Amino acid sequence: MVLDSVARIVKVQLPAYLKQLPVPDSITGFARLTVSDWLRLLPFLGVLALLGYLAVRPFFPKKKQQKDSLINLKIQKENPKVVNEINIEDLCLTKAAYCRCWRSKTFPACDGSHNKHNELTGDNVGPLILKKKEV
């Protein structure tokens, strides 16, 4: 039953459809087609365009995929939210840099790991820098 339907489509209906298409004999003949002729050609041209795209798609360059979709890959993963609290009065340095990319080996302090992260992912993250006000 199903094969009979497929055979009928391939052997009878498809050839009849293709015979009725207003395909001109030359390239200049396309300019003489009417709007109704173009509308009858539209499904056929759409199928040809789809098949052409599917044929050449494997040769298109692949999109660059991000290597790291998660931000925090390893720091305090047992906690539902990582929070580091630092008292500003306790800063004995005049300047401190804190990590925002989660790649630092000295987290929460920044060790410059964001540079490699930015290079790999195209991101632009940098450290949080705290400075003491000069009086």
From Swiss-Prot:
Cofactors that this protein relies on: [2Fe-2S] cluster
GO molecular function, one term: 2 iron, 2 sulfur cluster binding
Cofactor-binding details, from the entry: Binds 1 [2Fe-2S] cluster.
Biological process annotations from GO: autophagy of mitochondrion; regulation of autophagy
Keyword Nucleotide-binding: no
Membrane topology, from the record: Single-pass membrane protein
Cytoplasmic side: 61-135
A family per Pfam: zf-CDGSH
Lumenal-side positions: 1-37
Keywords per UniProt: 2Fe-2S, Autophagy, Endoplasmic reticulum, Iron, Iron-sulfur, Membrane, Metal-binding, Mitochondrion, Mitochondrion outer membrane, Transmembrane, Transmembrane helix
SMART domains linked to this entry: ZnF_CDGSH
Membrane-spanning segments: 38-60
Chief place of localization: endoplasmic reticulum
Tissue localization of expression: Brain.
Listed Gene3D superfamilies: CDGSH iron-sulfur domain, mitoNEET-type (3.40.5.90)
Subunit structure: Homodimer. Interacts with BCL2; the interaction is direct and disrupted by BIK interaction with BCL2. Interacts with BCL2L1. Interacts with ITPR1.
Protein name as annotated: CDGSH iron-sulfur domain-containing protein 2
